[in-house]
């Protein structure tokens, strides 16, 4: 793989909120760029900013950190997590947005195969976390074992390859423990919505 360089993307919103600055990698795996699913999610957050003030949130498999950074900019206390090789980019992006987020972000490793989500969270956020079959069971176990008040999952439909099969398996197997409640498209930002991207909440089965 060629050596990667970084470039900044400025994300603006349709209101009075400040812009986010997010660095991406020119050569990367799935974690080094901002996917459309992440853009759709953060514009949804910024459309309804008040509910996030003071909330305790953890983002799984954050990649660039954009989801957690957006929530911290809206007043949430956020733990942004990923594997060790992804933390440098996340930390760079956290620092680039420090004036908006203050000290409301912690960045740390969370290995789905051996770590657990901390107790007492208001929300767990997972944006496009399902790409590989090997991660499905650990992710489902991780989510089922956590006591967060809300679990939000975002997924852009993949139509080929391992990512397609992994998504199908995840949403089938997660039904053992949760049902998926979709956010209606009318509630999303009208400029940032797509039929092949879902934003939903996992509601625990009773």
Swiss-Prot record:
Transmembrane annotation, as ranges: none
Positions bound to S-adenosyl-L-methionine: 35, 61-63, 82, 112
EC annotation from Swiss-Prot or TrEMBL: 2.1.1.-
InterPro entries the record matches: Methyltransf_16, SAM-dependent_MTases_sf
CDD domains: AdoMet_MTases (cd02440)
Entry annotated with the keyword Methyltransferase: yes
A biological process from GO: methylation
Transferase keyword on record: yes
Residues making up the signal peptide according to the UniProt record: none
Classification via Pfam families: Methyltransf_16 (PF10294)
Recorded GO MF terms: protein methyltransferase activity
Keywords assigned by UniProt, alphabetized: Methyltransferase, S-adenosyl-L-methionine, Transferase
Family: Belongs to the methyltransferase superfamily. METTL21 family.
Free-text function comment from the UniProt entry: Protein-lysine N-methyltransferase.
UniProt name for this protein: Protein-lysine methyltransferase vkmt-1
Source organism (scientific name): Caenorhabditis elegans
């Amino acid at each position: 793989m060629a050596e990667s360089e970084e470039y900044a993307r400025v994300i603006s919103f349709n209101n009075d909120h400040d812009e986010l600055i997010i660095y991406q990698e020119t050569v990367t795996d799935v974690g080094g760029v901002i996917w459309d699913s992440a853009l759709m999610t953060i514009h949804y957050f910024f459309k309804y900013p008040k509910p996030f003030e003071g909330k305790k949130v953890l983002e799984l498999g954050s990649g660039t950190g954009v989801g957690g950074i957006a929530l911290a900019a809206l007043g949430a206390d956020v733990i942004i997590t990923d594997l060790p090789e992804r933390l440098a980019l996340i930390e760079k992006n956290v620092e680039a947005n420090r004036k908006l987020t203050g000290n409301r972000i912690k960045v740390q490793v969370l290995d789905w195969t051996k770590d657990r989500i901390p107790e007492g969270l208001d929300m767990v956020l997972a944006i496009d976390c399902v790409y590989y079959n090997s991660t499905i069971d650990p992710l489902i176990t991780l989510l089922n074992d956590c006591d967060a008040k809300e679990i939000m999952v975002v997924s852009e439909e993949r139509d080929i390859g391992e990512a397609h099969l992994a998504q199908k398996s995840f949403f089938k197997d997660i039904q053992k423990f949760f049902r998926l409640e979709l956010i209606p498209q009318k509630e999303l930002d009208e400029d940032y919505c797509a039929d092949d991207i879902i934003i939903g909440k996992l509601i625990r089965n009773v």
